[in-house]
């Protein structure tokens, strides 16, 4: 099939990763993408929009007749790009962006069963005692609450007993008045007692609920850290965070609903039905149960029907928000192609859908409220008619009528919220589904049972790759039978073109991934056979993009060894050549580095990364293009720090700039996933037609064409670009909801 060309002039950019996912989903669609600058490569997947809705597409098409707009719409129509992935498992979304890795959902019964283990933990007898006390207080509150209508009944009967069918206080004896007064006081005590039991129940059960939420959230957090790197690379971190947040809030709501609403209401319904059956007869209980059943069935059915309108409303709201934010963030692009009218009409299309769905939501809510009132009124009227007949026949008193009326009206209050509670409980279970589905995900990188720790010293820290094959996607080999050895205490560099597998070697060595074939050894021990913690403790990494925590410089330095002393931190800062720069900062080591370290320059961030790697003090050090984004002056200073650091250590340098690894003991050149050349710098240069010599000459010719020295990369400009991308990401993440469910 002829490929669909998406030209650059249309202003439409798409990630390569997004393209690969599209090609996996539909083999009939092929696309070529162009990238105008580095920021375009890193745009979020949700910056593309689904415009396949015929009604929305036709309205937009009619109002925009510019050729550029039509090209964009035509491209989107054929590609069927999705705006975002829903994290609610029962709402048409999924936890995985990869269709080959769709996670199995956890049904509601398993969710409630798993939640019960946290509410009734075997190792916490204090929490179990609180649950028992809470249930006892619940029963006490409902029994006391049911006593209130009885107090009314006795008061009315006492005041009415001397006057027949007419209530006449002037003729009532003092004893009757005294008894009625006592009964009315009992009524007040009953109401007060019911409120007291309810509040005590809330106070006692609060610790159980919060402890359950904390333990579940902690377990999910630890589980996510134990999952393999492939899982995290295929997910949006913001979506994971929202999934955990929604799931924990869902747990809180379900516990509250079960303990404070659904459970008490069900108990009170059974209690009232039993009382009416015992005091008034089976027909009273039958009418009551029939009314409550019809009320519940109507509420559940209408609420389920209304949910679709709520979903449509939220989806349109999210789409309108995303469209507005994306349009404003791309203000210049809109101006370049005169598409202001197109953007406005597109935005208005989403608002029209929102308006229509909102009206449906409001009107169906009115219908729900009316239906509930009608059902309850019919049932209450039937009960009152039966009670009146009983009074006329002499089998019931006026007090019985008051009691029956009071019992039913007490039930009406929690029943009024049944629709809301049902809808929110249903949504909470969906949110919890996502949370517990995350817990059910199994990592691909598993540690063997009773695996011994890796035993390695700097003198024995050899690294050996033995016929290693690896592929991220089936059929696309990244490493194709790679074998090499790094002697202990030596510096070995790995170079090659983009996609040759350089960074993959670092990930395999750290066991972020497993090779499909072959073995990797450290100090003669297969890394598959040793404990993960000991393996990763023995290897230090200085990444290309040093990401720092939003905390102080001291915290980020100490992160290399959280048990280190302050003097140790200062020592490694001096070794990395950043100590003096820190002392010049306003708050010195207490200076906040900002989100991802954006308040520091690129060189400062790399020095912090080097310092904390020194503080870790591992026998093996890996440098993954640690200076590729820095200017030559900063790079030279950092390389000097690295030389001091790698003395007597086994070190592997993944390099893009060959000038940084000329002093390596051995250089390994990768080409198409294989070891193409090996040797030191001079040996490889002296080899006629070698890949290394070609790379060296190419890089030198670029430097010479730009002058005697390579032009420095303006760090502050790069920093501003990072800040801009960060701001854009935060704005996009601020759009709440997934649009595929009633969140």
UniProtKB/Swiss-Prot annotation:
- Where is glutathione annotated to bind? 306-310, 369-372, 419
Q: Where does ATP bind?
A: 472, 496-503
Ranges that cross the membrane: 132-152, 169-189, 251-271, 282-302, 365-385, 401-421
A Pfam family hit = ABC_membrane
Tell me the keywords, alphabetical order. Answer: ATP-binding, Membrane, Mitochondrion, Mitochondrion inner membrane, Nucleotide-binding, Transit peptide, Transmembrane, Transmembrane helix, Transport
Q: Where is this region: Disordered?
A: 45-64, 703-724
Task: Please state every residue range assigned to the domain named ABC transporter.
Answer: 463-697
Q: Where is the composition biased (Basic and acidic residues)?
A: 712-724
Q: Which domain of life is it from?
A: Eukaryota
Please state which protein family the record places this protein in.
Belongs to the ABC transporter superfamily. ABCB family. Heavy Metal importer (TC 3.A.1.210) subfamily.
Quaternary structure annotation from Swiss-Prot or TrEMBL: Homodimer.
The name this protein carries in UniProt is Iron-sulfur clusters transporter ABCB7, mitochondrial
Its gene name is abcb7
């Amino acid at each position: 099939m002829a490929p669909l060309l998406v030209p650059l002039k249309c202003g439409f950019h798409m990630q390569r990763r997004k393209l690969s996912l599209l090609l996996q989903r539909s083999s009939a669609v092929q696309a070529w993408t162009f990238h105008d600058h580095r920021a375009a490569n890193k745009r979020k997947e949700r910056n593309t929009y689904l415009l396949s809705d015929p009604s929305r597409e036709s309205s937009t098409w009619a109002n925009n007749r510019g050729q550029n707009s039509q090209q964009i719409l035509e491209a989107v129509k054929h590609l069927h790009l999705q705006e975002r992935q829903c994290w609610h498992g029962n709402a048409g979304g999924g936890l995985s962006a990869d269709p080959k890795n769709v996670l199995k959902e956890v049904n509601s019964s398993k969710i409630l069963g798993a939640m019960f283990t946290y509410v009734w933990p075997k190792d916490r007898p204090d929490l179990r005692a609180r649950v028992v006390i809470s249930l006892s207080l619940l029963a006490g509150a409902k029994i006391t609450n049911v006593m209130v209508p009885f107090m009314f009944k006795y008061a009315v009967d006492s005041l009415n007993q001397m006057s027949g069918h007419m209530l006449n206080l002037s003729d009532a004896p003092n004893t009757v008045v005294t008894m009625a007064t006592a009964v009315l006081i009992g009524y007040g005590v009953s109401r007060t007692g019911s409120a007291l039991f309810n509040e005590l129940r809330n106070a006692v059960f609060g610790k159980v609920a919060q402890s359950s939420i904390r333990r579940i959230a902690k377990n999910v957090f630890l589980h996510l850290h134990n999952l393999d790197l492939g899982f995290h690379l295929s997910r949006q971190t913001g979506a994971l965070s929202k999934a955990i947040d929604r799931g924990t809030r869902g747990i809180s709501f379900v516990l509250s609903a079960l303990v404070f609403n659904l459970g008490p209401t069900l108990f009170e319904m059974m209690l009232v039905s039993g009382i009416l059956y015992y005091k008034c007869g089976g027909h009273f209980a039958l009418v009551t149960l029939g009314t409550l059943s019809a009320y519940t069935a109507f509420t559940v059915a209408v609420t389920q029907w209304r949910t679709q309108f709520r979903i449509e409303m939220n989806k349109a709201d999210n789409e309108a928000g995303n469209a507005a934010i994306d349009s404003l963030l791309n203000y210049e692009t809109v101006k370049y192609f005169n598409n202001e009218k197109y953007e406005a009409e597109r935005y208005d299309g989403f608002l029209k859908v929102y308006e229509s769905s909102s009206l449906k939501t409001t009107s169906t809510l009115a219908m729900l409220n009316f239906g509930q009132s009608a059902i309850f009124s019919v049932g209450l009227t039937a009960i009152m008619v039966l009670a009146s007949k009983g009074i006329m026949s002499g089998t019931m008193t006026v007090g019985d009528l008051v009691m029956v009326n009071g019992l039913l009206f007490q039930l009406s209050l929690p029943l009024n919220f049944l629709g809301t509670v049902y809808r929110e409980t249903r949504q909470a279970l969906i949110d919890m589904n996502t949370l517990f589905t995350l817990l059910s995900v199994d990592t691909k990188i598993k540690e063997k049972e009773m695996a011994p720790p890796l035993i390695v010293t700097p003198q024995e820290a050899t690294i050996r790759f033995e016929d290693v094959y690896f592929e991220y996607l089936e059929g696309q080999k990244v490493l194709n039978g790679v074998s090499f050895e790094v002697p202990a205490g030596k510096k070995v560099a790995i170079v090659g073109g983009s996609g040759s597998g350089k960074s993959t070697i670092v990930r395999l060595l750290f066991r972020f991934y497993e090779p499909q074939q072959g073995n990797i050894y450290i100090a003669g021990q297969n890394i598959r056979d040793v404990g993960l913690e000991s393996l990763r403790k023995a290897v230090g990494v200085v990444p290309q993009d040093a990401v720092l925590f939003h905390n102080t410089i001291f915290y980020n330095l100490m992160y290399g060894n959280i048990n280190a002393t302050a003097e140790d931190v200062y020592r490694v800062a001096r070794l990395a050549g950043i100590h003096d720069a820190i002392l010049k900062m306003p708050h010195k080591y207490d200076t906040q580095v900002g989100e991802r370290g954006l308040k520091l320059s690129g060189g400062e961030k790399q020095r912090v990364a080097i310092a904390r790697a020194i503080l870790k003090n591992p026998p093996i050090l890996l440098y993954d293009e640690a200076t590729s984004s820095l200017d030559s002056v900063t790079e030279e200073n950092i390389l000097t720090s690295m030389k001091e650091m790698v003395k007597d250590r086994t070190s592997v340098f993944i390099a893009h700039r060959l000038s940084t690894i000329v002093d390596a003991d051995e250089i390994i050149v990768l080409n198409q996933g294989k070891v193409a050349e090996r040797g030191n710098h001079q040996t490889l240069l002296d080899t006629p037609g070698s890949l290394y010599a070609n790379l060296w000459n190419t890089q030198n010719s670029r430097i010479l064409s730009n002058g005697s020295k390579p032009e420095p990369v303006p760090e502050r400009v790069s920093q501003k670009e990072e800040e801009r991308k960060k701001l854009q990401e935060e704005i996009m993440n601020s759009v709440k909801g997934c649009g595929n469910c009633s969140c």
